[in-house]
Amino acid sequence: MLQRIYLDNNATTRIDPKVKEIMDPFLRDHYGNPSSLHQFGTETHPAIAEALDKLYKGINARDIDDVIITSCATESNNWVLKGVYFDECLKKGKNHIVTTVAEHPAVRSTCNFLESLGVEVTYLPINEHGSITAEQVKEAITEKTALVSVMWANNETGLIFPIEEIGAICKEKGVLFHTDAVQAIGKIPVDVLKANADFLSFSAHKFHGPKGIGGLYIRSGVGLTPLFHGGEHMNGRRSGTLNVPYIVGMGEAMKLAVEHLDYEKEVVGKLRDKLEEALLKIPDVMVVGDRIHRVPNTTLVSVRGIEGEAMLWDLNRSNIAASTGSACASEDLEANPVMVAIGASKELAHTAIRLSLSRFNTEAEIDKTIEVFSQAAVRLRNISSSY
């Protein structure tokens, strides 16, 4: 069987063997419902507490704060936006939300839905580097602003947004602040206190944990109407039987993610840079966005004259996995939204390819990818009518 190379880690990651190992006993032996009073239920409590402790430490949350288990970051994002709608928009008359055009569909689409209910949403434009400034946020806030929601790192470009500056402005203005940290955790340090975050979303499968489990940090003293009703789980904030093996796995994945931050910067970042520099030697290839303020694993490149989907399928034939954009929207075959947002033509935006690495990638895999990508660029341009 030919070697398979996975460079789509911003879509999902392989589960770390240590995570699988720690989950196994709770899939096999300790399967009781944690809410049950008998020993099958109560024997799971120490493992849940330990996992939550790892999550708290991973984002520097305080004991008085809440880290609520959810099914994924999409749920967490929906919960924040819709909860704020109930708590701030309907009850207090604060009918304005500030976000950006670069957000994940889980935020953008939810904001679109809230607009249909009468909420005013300001979508801040990104500049030619793919970023926004804290000053843009400050200027957008009004007396009616209920929430500012800005991602910590962009899923397409890997660009890091000025979260600490934005959080400080929101605190000064008395406006709730939410950040989607899905693409930041495990790649750069994430500290909810330094960020002045009221809410922070994350998803285990983006940092080598299991799929179908995520979390929402809620700062102490901040109310949020539940999205689900039907039980008193998670201090009454989210109903549903706790998924013990996945909670345990997510906790361990968070612990490992923090332990590997230096490796991400020093090793994964250098592999990304090696890949990027080699691809830039191909004529008419460019890197999209700021190349300095990025997470270390991500590059978004445009190969002029080649449809991103064509390059994607060519790479796939050689057992290399990449992406043309967000996995939650990639089947739509739309132009890359970040490239459109920075002002690229739709023709150019269709040429984007995202390559995202992990700590499990090797230098040999990067060398092979460079070889295959370079050959594919020549072959596809030879048959292209637009180059």
Curated annotation (Swiss-Prot):
It comes from the Bacteria. Its EC number is 2.8.1.7. Pfam families: Aminotran_5. It catalyses: (sulfur carrier)-H + L-cysteine = (sulfur carrier)-SH + L-alanine. It is found in: Cytoplasm. Disulfide bonds: none annotated. Its cofactor is pyridoxal 5'-phosphate. GO terms for cellular component: cytoplasm. Pyridoxal 5'-phosphate binds at A73, T74, N155, Q183, S203, A204, H205, T241. The keyword Transferase applies. One of its GO terms (molecular function) is 2 iron, 2 sulfur cluster binding. Gene3D superfamilies: Aspartate Aminotransferase, domain 1, Type I PLP-dependent aspartate aminotransferase-like (Major domain). Coiled coil: none annotated. The modification N6-(pyridoxal phosphate)lysine is found at K206. Keywords: 2Fe-2S, Cytoplasm, Iron, Iron-sulfur, Metal-binding, Pyridoxal phosphate, Transferase. GO terms for biological process: [2Fe-2S] cluster assembly; cysteine metabolic process. [2Fe-2S] cluster binds at C328. InterPro entries: Aminotrans_V_dom, Cys_deSase_IscS, Cys_deSase_NifS_proteobacteria, Cysteine_dSase, PyrdxlP-dep_Trfase, PyrdxlP-dep_Trfase_major, PyrdxlP-dep_Trfase_small. It is an enzyme of class 2 (transferase). Pathway: Cofactor biosynthesis; iron-sulfur cluster biosynthesis. Homodimer. Forms a heterotetramer with IscU, interacts with other sulfur acceptors. Belongs to the class-V pyridoxal-phosphate-dependent aminotransferase family. NifS/IscS subfamily. Master enzyme that delivers sulfur to a number of partners involved in Fe-S cluster assembly, tRNA modification or cofactor biosynthesis. Catalyzes the removal of elemental sulfur atoms from cysteine to produce alanine. Functions as a sulfur delivery protein for Fe-S cluster synthesis onto IscU, an Fe-S scaffold assembly protein, as well as other S acceptor proteins. This is Cysteine desulfurase IscS.
